[in-house]
Amino acid sequence: MLSTMQTVGAILMLSIVFVAGTKRHACDSKYSEVTPTHTMCLTDNANAVAVTLTQEVKVQIVRMHNVIRATVNDAANMMKMEWDDRLAAVAQKWAMQCILGHDGFANHAEPDLPGYVGQNVGWSNYHMTFPDVVDLWAAEIEDYEYGVWNDNTGHYIQQIYAEASRIGCGQSACGEDRYFVCNYYKSTMGNTPYAQGSRCGQCPNSCWEELCDCTSGPDACCNGGSLNIDTCECQCPRLWSGADCQEKQCPDHDYEDMCDYPDVVNNPEYWCQFSNIRSDCPIRCGDCP
């Protein structure tokens, strides 16, 4: 078998954006409002041909990721992953640019999912299948050490990021070249992709084949909410409620006395830029009537 570099160009350059000079076209306002350079607002490369991923391939991609995740022996909070068509649409659009690299966090953000979306990219100049590429990303485990960042293990770290519960992928052909893109929600952050402990240690009530299965729960917890992976329910900040923390529950008065301090009263524009003040003083900060 050829080496990774011989078979597929697989790089993780999250800080580099390659959309400069790419023509743009009108797109759904939900994307352009995130940023005018959003990937969904780009024009496809004239040489790009979409490679349709069959349902069988989608299922295989998800299954492979879940097997990879379930084999992490010391992960206490590893979530089961599922397919997401929204992520897949953006991944496909980036694949149609025929660019070996990443489009940047803001450019592949999904407006319906708060927080960062991660991305793995691969390239091949001969016939490879998507499962082949997923395997190559996973092979980076050979260089992986928990808690130690290694530029050669970025794809694998994204695959095993505990909170990455949704995935969508796209593929294109540009002449003899093949481009593979998978977008993940959420994006890995740092070099500790999961909490160490016994398998399903943090989710005994939702455990499924060594993974925390919240696929029947909300897609995301909005407005600063967090997902309890044991109950698969959102834990919402006090101003918010509902299954995904999008129902505002305004109080009759602000929560803290400090909201009436002269400094806050006289200069709310300044003080309300701080998240704790905005949370404590929803009326003073104009979030509630």
Curated annotation (Swiss-Prot):
Expressed by the venom duct. GO terms for cellular component: extracellular region. The keyword Secreted applies. The keyword Ligase does not apply. It is found in: Secreted. InterPro entries: CAP_dom, CAP_sf, CRISP-related. Residues 62-184 form the SCP domain. Changing E33D: In form 1, form 2 and Mr30-1. The modification 4-carboxyglutamate is found at E33. Contains 11 disulfide bonds. Keywords: Cleavage on pair of basic residues, Disulfide bond, Gamma-carboxyglutamic acid, Secreted, Signal. It comes from the Eukaryota. Residues 1-24 form the signal peptide. Pfam families: CAP. Its main location: secreted. Has no proteolytic activity. Belongs to the CRISP family. This is Cysteine-rich venom protein Mr30. It comes from Conus marmoreus (Marble cone).
